[in-house]
């Protein structure tokens, strides 16, 4: 089973396209929607929903993935639920990048302070990161510098921030999921 979390643009038709692409490596792809506007509520909702679908699935190696803000949540929720994660162009600091877009971006900072200390060290090797060199939203060299001591990073040469085509990375995802 693969759980897919959308980014900030939850209504993008690209979300459906990504789910269809993910079905090439796993028939059971679950799309979990969340508000993007209320971080504390989103975290509670995502923890509950992800735990529920993990319990329902008959998969010894479930995987959670997302793009941008969805990648942020994939890493945290995946860690808390004990499943592997794949992040595409993660928004690592939504407390800064979401300022002006949502009412309470400081809630992300509060979430970070309440998260397990050094969770990336404890999550070592449980997350695969795919970064685009053409990300127009984030400087992924900074993202790589923050994550490369914990996770394997794959660079993509062509995709923009929303990562429309994940198909080039499906085999790496499948190998990571089943390893």
From Swiss-Prot:
Pfam family, one: UPF0227
UniProt-listed Gene3D superfamilies: alpha/beta hydrolase
InterPro entries according to UniProt: AB_hydrolase_fold, UPF0227, UPF0227/Esterase_YqiA
Chain segments annotated as transmembrane: none
Top-rank lineage group of the source organism: Bacteria
PANTHER family noted in UniProt: ESTERASE YQIA-RELATED, UPF0227 PROTEIN YCFP
Similarity comment text for this entry: Belongs to the UPF0227 family.
Name of this chain's protein: UPF0227 protein VIBHAR_01524
Protein source organism: Vibrio campbellii (strain ATCC BAA-1116)
